């Protein structure tokens, strides 16, 4: 679905600018996303591909009149996509200052900088999101799953990518504890993305 070179790496080194095409309207047209050369995560990894597929697969289930959250935004690719598919308000959360700087360059290059606002971890925000997408690995999502779900609106969509397939049972149990539905699981090689609905 995503036209790009895929590397099975966590650390990226984009030696040149990338033009990424995301098919829409049953592949009749595409959204173009431009990512500058750099090292922030989020363009050349299988999990980014899975996250984009998950977003596009659920595009008809999303309330675009509310706000979305890109949690662990890296290069900004998912924030850019969210802006281009219809969100006028996107919160981008990234703790790495260098990644934020690269992301801002990418937001401006894609002309969506006015739609995206950088936020710290939304512990102090009263915002409820119709869509939260997170393409990060490690234990962070497991430890904070309940809190992140609490930031979803009713019928809100939560997309997690960056997961090894071995984590499926753990996140299935977390979904049961939080009483949210698993809509789908997308798999590519050893990686997976899970799609939840509150």
Where are these regions (language model features)?
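Residues that mark the start of a beta-strand
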Residues: 31-35, 66-67
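Conserved SAM/SAH cofactor-binding pocket of Class I
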Residues: 39-120
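S-adenosylmethionine
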Residues: 53, 95-194
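N-terminal auxiliary segments of SAM/dcSAM-dependent transferases
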Residues: 1-26
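Ser/Thr- (and often Asn-) enriched beta-sheet segments in non-cytosolic proteins
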Residues: 19-21, 32-34, 117, 181-184
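Residue-level preference for short coil/turn positions at secondary-structure junctions
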Residues: 16, 28-29, 64, 86, ...
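C-terminal lobe and adjacent flexible extensions of AdoMet/dcAdoMet transferase-like proteins
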Residues: 196-198
